Structure formats: C-alpha cells, structure tokens
C-alpha cells in the first residue's frame, strides 16, 4: 500500500516499493530507502558511476550506451568528464564513451568532451564513508502509463504483463539528438512556415475566400473552412518534437471531425466515407513528414559535436513498445524513466542515532520535490524508520511540532509508529529548533550522543514529552518484573478507529507503546513474552496491522497485554 501522507510525500513498505510502474504512475521521481538492502528489484547495485543496465518489465536488460549512475565519479583508473563533477544539471546529457566494444559493433561515439584525471585523494569512496551515495536507476515504460487515466491500479499489472518478454542477455538502444542543431533546424522551419502562412493569409484576404485543392469542401461555410484550414496549414515543423508521435492521434482526428461536420449539411450519408478518405490522405502526408524528420534526426546523431542532448518522440502505448522491441528499433529516451534513489543505513533499534541521517535525507527530499516530482520514503515494514524521517522533514518545514505532525501522519497512515528511541530523538530535534549545530543545552546532549550512543539513555530522564509523573507501575504477575507505567498506556481514540458492532462494553486488555523489550524485527506480528529470562511467560500479542480490543476498538499498530497477566502497583509503595 503506497499512501500519500503530505504534499509530494508518499510512504510504504519495501514490498510496495518494488511496484516500479505504480511509482511511475504516481509521478514519483525519487525513492528514499531507510535501511540498507539489495531487495529493490528495479535497482541495479554496482560501484561505478555509469551503468549499462536498464529495468524492463521484471528484469534488467543491457543497453548499448552507458547511462549516468552517480553524480560523483567513483575512484577508478579511467578518466571522467570534469563537467559532470560540478552539478547534476548535465547528467541527462552525459554518456560514457568507454567500454563500448559490443558484439554488433554498432555503438558510435556520442560525446566529445574534455577529460581530466581525478585525484583519488580528493574523492571519498563508499568504503571510506561506509555510506551509499544517491544514484539513478532507469526503467523502460510506455507513456500510456502516465497519460492514460483508464490505466489505473486495478489493470496496471495486466497492462505490464502484456509487455513483450525479453531475455536477460538482450541488448536495447535508445535515441538522442543534439539540442542546438535541432533548435536551429526548427527555427528555420518555423520561419519558413510562418512566411508561407503569411503569404497564404495575404492571398486569402485578397481573394476574400478560402480555396482548397479538394473540391468536395470548397463550398463549406466560412467558420468550418477556417477550422479546417488551421489544421491543414500545420506541419511537424510547427509542432514540438515531443509531440510528433501524437500527431496521428490528434491532428487527423480534428481534421476528419471538422470535415464530417461541414459535410453533414451537404452529404450526410457520405460523411463517414469522406472522413476515411481524408484520414488516408492526411496519414500519408504525416508519414512522409515523419520519414523526413527521422532522416534529419539520424544525420544529426552522426554529427556529434556537442554533449547537449534533447530527446525526442514518445512510444505511447504497450503495442507500439512491443513493436519497437521486436523490430530492434531505437527506444526514445522519453520512454526511459529516470528514478533517483538513496539508501540510508538505519537500524530499527533502541541504540540507533537516527538524527545523524536527517540532513542527508532532507537534502535528498528537497532535490526531488524541487523538480515537481513526488518522493517515496519507505523502510522494511513501512512503520518506524520511514515515518521518523518523514516527521523530521515535515516538522522542520511547517514548524508545527513533532506531536502535531505525528497525529496528522497517523490519521492518513495508521501504521506509522516510530520506536520509542526514535520518537525521543525527534522531540530532541524539535527542542534544538530542527538544527544539529548549536550551543544550547539540548545541542550539548546531542553532541554526547554523537560521541557515544549509550548516552541516548539520558533522553529518558529529560521527559521531552512533558508527561506527568507516572503513578502506577505494571508488573508481571508471575515474576514481579516491571513492564511499563501508566504514562505508556494508549487510550482508545474513537475519532480514529470506530468501534465494531456486537462486542462487549468492557476492556480486558491493555494497549501500550512499543517498549525496548518487545522484539519485532522483520516480523508483522508475534507474541509478547515477559522479558525476564527466568520467566518468559506469555503476556499478550502484538501486530503492526492492528488488534481489536474486547470492546470493539481497533488499535493500529497494537501491543496488547492481557489485564489478567499483570499487577498494578503504586509507584510510591514500590520505591
């Protein structure tokens, strides 16, 4: 389940994060994985700054051109483009020229760039930092996934299944042309067409009528004739290159429809036949123009004097994509989805310092949102780590506090539940005014935590939640081990979960916050046992998907203890 929780921000678990075509449908341009894993199926894991692997349907296939993998080059003996190191704005336009000897010898050099050797001492590798850099993954997709409203989540999987099956050793190639040459070509064509249109308009004004070669529509009304003339005077040189492939759908449809309306008054019985005739004529004309554009584009690709690229055309639906793959044609770069990805190695434990990851995570989230793309933040179960990162980011932006945003997050995604350690650190982050550098008492506490994670225990003493002093402790009835206090009991919130019918009126269970002694790693539900090794008796159960109380209230997530297994003791008497 992928859920939108805030503007531009989605949350899920690792299983849903693998639904790459659903992510494309949701316009997600970046994925933040809050644990170190290699189970993202569409992510190609390697240590190079380029890749020749691209994800298609459910496998990786090879590409005949290298694609940028990372913004910063990895330490190698090879030379890299010095222009790439400075920023990310040229990433789309850079293609590695090395390792290009393929079996078919069809690979051609795309860029001629100035190269310089990088001093390895100036670059910190992944092994030194023990952190993964953000990288890019590439996915082949038909544009219909984004543009077609009928392609929803219900039939998206069937739509993907209809894509052509390829072997893992298959090679595909994609298509690029030079932006400057294309721009000049289009400008010249636009100027010529504008002059032609002006001459035509002058002739039409002098003649006070509109004349066409086709005699069947020469006597139509002025309004309909003008509408027809607009479509007929257009050409591919006036249409942006990204829309060339849509001409057959929009261009001839409008013209045929206009002709049909015009002819209904004269020959209503022949309007359909007339439409087919004009469609054939127009399709023939468009096919000729497409052949011309394609030949010009191929010439431009052979004259590679600049690495500033623009990508043309679209494959609109899966049928066109399958045909293109069967005939070994070039895949338009517009049908290659570029996904930004970052791994954060966060452990869901009670001694993990999650605040050391927030600055890197926030920069990554901003870089995705600034491009008007959505971002998916997920962890293994989609509960603790990802929700903690989301709370830190949103609270820093809106300044409404961790508790307020946590309640808002749970109202949209009930599974969100940072562990007790993470939540205390988030409250400390709020006390530090969402900064990690400072000279306040709270900043000094965080500096101690950075030096030694054992100092996280000090956060328990600070009472960052501003809770009242607890009155009761709850102990195991069999061994008298202290389990929790009354401040850690979760009361029923009937505004969030409705009470189910046909249940009793009394509660026989107690729901508590997640405690350190509750082990939930890599599981969705389990049994709550006494943490005392000599006892280990069953106290209750837990589930990330929720448990229903005896009164009918549904608690999500739930850590439920049977009231008959614990004793309530006054704290003043136990001291």
Swiss-Prot record:
| CDD domains membership | DSP
Q: What class of enzyme is it?
A: hydrolase
Keyword RNA-binding in annotation = no
Q: Where in the cell is it found?
A: Cytoplasm; Nucleus
Q: Where is the composition biased (Low complexity)?
A: 187-208
Q: Which UniProt keywords apply?
A: Cytoplasm, Hydrolase, Metal-binding, Nucleus, Protein phosphatase, Zinc
Q: How is the cofactor bound?
A: Binds 2 Zn(2+) ions.
SMART domains assigned: DSPc
Record flagged with keyword Calcium? no
Per the entry, which co-factors are needed? Answer: Zn(2+)
Instruction: Fetch the PROSITE patterns from UniProt.
Output: TYR_PHOSPHATASE_1, TYR_PHOSPHATASE_2, TYR_PHOSPHATASE_DUAL
Chief location category: cytoplasm
Annotated catalysed reactions: O-phospho-L-tyrosyl-[protein] + H2O = L-tyrosyl-[protein] + phosphate; O-phospho-L-seryl-[protein] + H2O = L-seryl-[protein] + phosphate
GO MF annotation list: protein serine/threonine phosphatase activity; protein tyrosine phosphatase activity; protein tyrosine/serine/threonine phosphatase activity; structural constituent of nuclear pore; zinc ion binding
Q: Report the superkingdom from the record.
A: Eukaryota
A Pfam family the protein falls into: DSPc
Which family does the UniProt entry place this protein in?
Belongs to the protein-tyrosine phosphatase family. Non-receptor class dual specificity subfamily.
Subunit (UniProt): Interacts with PES.
Name used for this protein in its record = Dual specificity protein phosphatase YVH1
State the organism named in the record. Plasmodium falciparum (isolate 3D7)
């Amino acid at each position: 389940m992928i859920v939108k929780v805030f503007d531009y921000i989605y949350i899920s678990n690792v299983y849903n994060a693998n639904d790459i075509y659903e992510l494309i449908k949701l316009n997600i341009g970046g994925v933040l994985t809050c644990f170190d894993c290699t189970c993202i199926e569409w992510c190609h894991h390697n240590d190079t700054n380029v890749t020749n692997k691209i994800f298609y349907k459910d496998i990786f296939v090879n590409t005949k051109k290298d694609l940028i993998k990372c913004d910063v080059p990895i330490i190698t003996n090879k030379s890299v483009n010095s222009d790439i190191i400075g920023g990310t704005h040229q990433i789309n336009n850079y293609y590695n020229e090395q390792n290009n000897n393929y079996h078919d010898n069809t690979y051609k050099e795309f860029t001629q760039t100035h190269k310089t050797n990088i001093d390895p001492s100036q670059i910190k590798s992944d092994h030194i930092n023990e952190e993964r850099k953000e990288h890019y993954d590439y996915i082949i997709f038909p544009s219909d996934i984004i543009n077609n409203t009928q392609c929803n989540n219900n039939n998206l999987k069937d739509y993907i299944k209809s894509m052509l099956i390829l072997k893992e050793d298959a090679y595909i190639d994609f298509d690029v042309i030079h932006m400057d040459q294309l721009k000049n070509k289009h400008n010249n064509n636009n100027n010529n067409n504008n002059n032609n249109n002006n001459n035509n308009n002058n002739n039409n004004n002098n003649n006070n009528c509109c004349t066409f070669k086709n005699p069947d529509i020469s006597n139509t009304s002025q309004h309909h004739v003008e509408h027809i003339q607009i479509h007929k005077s257009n050409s591919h040189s006036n249409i942006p290159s990204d829309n060339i492939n849509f001409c057959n759908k929009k261009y001839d449809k409008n013209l045929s429809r206009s002709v049909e309306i015009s002819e209904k008054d004269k020959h209503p019985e022949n309007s359909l036949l007339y439409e087919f005739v004009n469609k054939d004529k127009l399709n023939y004309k468009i096919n000729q123009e497409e052949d011309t554009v394609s030949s010009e584009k191929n010439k431009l690709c052979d004259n590679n004097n600049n690495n500033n690229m623009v990508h043309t055309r679209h494959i609109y639906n899966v049928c066109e994509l399958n045909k293109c793959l069967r005939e070994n044609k070039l895949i338009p770069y517009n049908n290659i989805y570029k996904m930004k990805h970052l791994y954060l190695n966060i452990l869901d434990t009670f001694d993990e310092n999650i605040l050391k990851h927030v600055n890197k995570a926030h920069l990554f989230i901003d870089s995705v949102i600034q491009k008007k793309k959505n971002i998916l933040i997920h962890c293994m179960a989609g509960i603790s780590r990802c929700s903690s990162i989301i709370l830190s980011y949103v609270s820093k932006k809106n300044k409404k506090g961790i508790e307020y945003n946590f309640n808002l997050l749970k109202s949209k995604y009930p599974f969100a539940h940072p562990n007790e350690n993470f939540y205390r650190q988030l409250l400390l982050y709020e006390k530090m005014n969402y900064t990690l550098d400072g000279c306040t008492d709270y900043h000094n506490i965080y500096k101690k935590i950075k030096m030694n994670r054992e100092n996280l225990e000090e956060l328990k003493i600070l009472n960052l939640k501003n809770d009242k002093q607890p009155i009761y402790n709850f102990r195991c009835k069999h061994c008298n081990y202290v389990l929790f206090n009354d401040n850690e009991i979760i009361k029923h919130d009937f505004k969030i979960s409705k009470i189910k019918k046909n249940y009793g009126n009394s509660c026989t269970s107690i729901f508590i916050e997640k405690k350190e002694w509750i082990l939930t790693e890599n599981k969705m539900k389990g049994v709550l046992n006494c943490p005392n090794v000599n006892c280990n008796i069953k106290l209750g159960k837990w589930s990330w998907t929720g448990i229903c109380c005896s009164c009918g209230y549904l608690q999500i997530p739930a850590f439920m203890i049977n009231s008959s297994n614990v004793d309530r003791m006054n704290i003043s008497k136990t001291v």
